[in-house]
A protein has these predicted regions:
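Local beta-strand/beta-hairpin segments that build beta-sheet-rich folds
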Residues: 1, 74-75
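A short gly/proline-enriched turn/hairpin at secondary-structure junctions
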Residues: 40-44
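C-terminal lobe/hinge of AMP-binding adenylation domains
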Residues: 35-37
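Unchanged
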Residues: 46-69, 77-130
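Acidic, metal-coordinating catalytic segment for phosphate/diphosphate chemistry
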Residues: 1-21
Length: 141
């Protein structure tokens, strides 16, 4: 793991939830989706039997209606926290560089809106781990 957020309490049993996310930085803007929680990177939870790359393809199609080109793995972060419904929770997030492609269908998640967020507004991302991952990606350029 490249970065761990939070502190693991050895007395607790955490529910792991792996996910995979795309980082597309183009012309000083970041590909994002906006939903009721706020701005997020395209991606989400990995389903049983699904590769990280397949997860990104599926989630991007569901959230944006667009195809993607996925590059090499960039970084990973996990977080030890208390989820308001799930209790002890450990989301494990894998980040990949890539590019959002053309729209091929309407998004199947109607509460998600695709947009390009100016990098100057990076702090608007809802998930701190995603802010860290984008900054890490920028350092690698």
């Amino acid at each position: 793991m490249d970065k761990t957020f939070g502190i693991r309490d050895p007395r607790l049993t955490y529910r792991d939830r792996p996910g995979a996310y795309l980082i597309d930085i183009t012309d000083g803007r970041l590909a994002c989706v906006h939903m009721h929680l706020g701005y997020l990177l395209p991606g989400g939870g990995i389903e049983a039997g699904e590769s990280r790359e397949d997860c990104i393809r599926r989630e991007c199609l569901e959230e944006t209606g667009r195809t993607v080109t996925i590059g090499a793995p960039l970084c990973a972060a996990d977080t030890y926290c208390m989820h308001h419904r799930l209790g002890p929770f450990n989301p494990i997030q894998y980040y990949y560089r890539g590019a959002i492609g053309s729209k091929v269908q309407e998004p199947t998640e109607p509460d998600h809106t695709f947009l390009w967020l100016p990098l100057a507004e990076l702090s608007k991302l809802y998930v701190p781990q995603q802010i860290w991952a984008v900054r890490y990606a920028l350092e690698q350029e």
